[in-house]
Swiss-Prot record:
It is found in: Nucleus. Interacts with splicing factor proteins SFRS3/SRP20, TRA2B/SFRS10, KHDRBS1/SAM68 and KHDRBS3. The RBMY1 proteins are encoded by repeated regions of the Y chromosome, mostly within the AZFb region. The exact number of functional copies is unclear and may vary between individuals, and some of them may represent pseudogenes. The proteins are very similar, which makes the characterization of each protein difficult. Thus, most experiments do not discriminate between the different members. One can therefore suppose that reported interactions with a RBMY1 protein involve all the proteins. Residues 97-114, 149-159 have a biased composition (Low complexity). The gene is RBMY1D. Keywords: mRNA processing, mRNA splicing, Nucleus, RNA-binding. GO terms for biological process: mRNA processing; positive regulation of mRNA splicing, via spliceosome; RNA splicing. Testis-specific. It comes from Homo sapiens. Gene3D superfamilies: 3.30.70.330. Residues 67-349, 452-496 are annotated as: Disordered. Pfam families: RBM1CTR, RRM_1. RNA-binding protein which may be involved in spermatogenesis. Required for sperm development, possibly by participating in pre-mRNA splicing in the testis. This is RNA-binding motif protein, Y chromosome, family 1 member D.
Amino acid sequence: MVEADHPGKLFIGGLNRETNEKMLKAVFGKHGPISEVLLIKDRTSKSRGFAFITFENPADAKNAAKDMNGKSLHGKAIKVEQAKKPSFQSGGRRRPPASSRNRSPSGSLRSARGSRGGTRGWLPSQEGHLDDGGYTPDLKMSYSRGLIPVKRGPSSRSGGPPPKKSAPSAVARSNSWMGSQGPMSQRRENYGVPPRRATISSWRNDRMSTRHDGYATNDGNHPSCQETRDYAPPSRGYAYRDNGHSNRDEHSSRGYRNHRSSRETRDYAPPSRGHAYRDYGHSRRDESYSRGYRNRRSSRETREYAPPSRGHGYRDYGHSRRHESYSRGYRNHPSSRETRDYAPPHRDYAYRDYGHSSWDEHSSRGYSYHDGYGEALGRDHSEHLSGSSYRDALQRYGTSHGAPPARGPRMSYGGSTCHAYSNTRDRYGRSWESYSSCGDFHYCDREHVCRKDQRNPPSLGRVLPDPREACGSSSYVASIVDGGESRSEKGDSSRY
């Protein structure tokens, strides 16, 4: 509610800009003694067109308001009425009232309250005197001030341009935020999920599938060159056979191959003659460590470990069905440098990896299709052989039961393991040439390398070790690796 500011205080609005305090006191002093004349001015000390006059007697103020209201003063009609306090200034500091002209106080009050209720300034003069130049600046000032504390959204009562601008800006801001959220979420869907799928699929291809990893399948199923560098070398039966046994073997073989640097490889896998087998190779689990280290060596390390190997890796590993997948993986994918990387170390652990009679035969046939899915296949080798491997193992077992480990080549039928192993002291010479093929028919069909070693035909006269000895005994392997005459064979298969 608007209440009277002071009983003897009047608001005079619509004054001429030239009217000053002395003129007002002279005109209104006729009605009674005046205690105060307050002319409202702007920053430039010019009159704003309204003033407040305080009479000592309230009755004199009422008489002056009735007499002077609507009359002309210095060429302009003025408005005189009782000064009122704004609702937010009751009991506080009093604001000067503006002058009114030719309008009733009640009408001005209703209009001001209806249109701009709650704004600052003196209510009787806020509505009707926008054209006289006296109160317009105060109205604009009050209007701008009134909007500052009320910033909760578009004002229904004041409804000026600023709220209209602010509302669309807020909407646009929210829309732009929502629009940006949409593409961002869409980008997340487009770019975040497929890499995860690709990772899963690659994981499946690396660990779940045996036929499509480039181990023992057609050329079209082999991985890329980089994948071959990581995964194809183990296709000789090493790492994937190790991965099929236990998680410990898998992490040891793959982890060391993927994460060890060349310097670490030199530290952990020295190129001593059969040293890797003597240190790590007495169990299948230990083989994964030595193989994992050797598979990741760079060409420089391989040249340091095995200088003479320049193309004989195919001849070493390609002449048995067991080595067929490995030779194909090498022939199809790695470069000559990769061949130098992976092929030369065969003289160190070729017998270690392949030299177990029935056990190795199973690794050639069984591991490519079965060993990645069960641990028992890798643990109990003599009980889980495939058909042909089992037949070959029995034949070998029948001819070599109770025979001591021989340095001569090991033979088998059906095109399976029939490479001649003869360890040599000259391991940096041509020891890999001692792995000559005897009857590898599958390799001839697939790779068109049908050069059988004519100098060492297959014969059962050269007895083989007991499969149980080949599987379980590490002393047998150590004796073969450490002691043996070099039966290096320079055949027509030394050049591929």
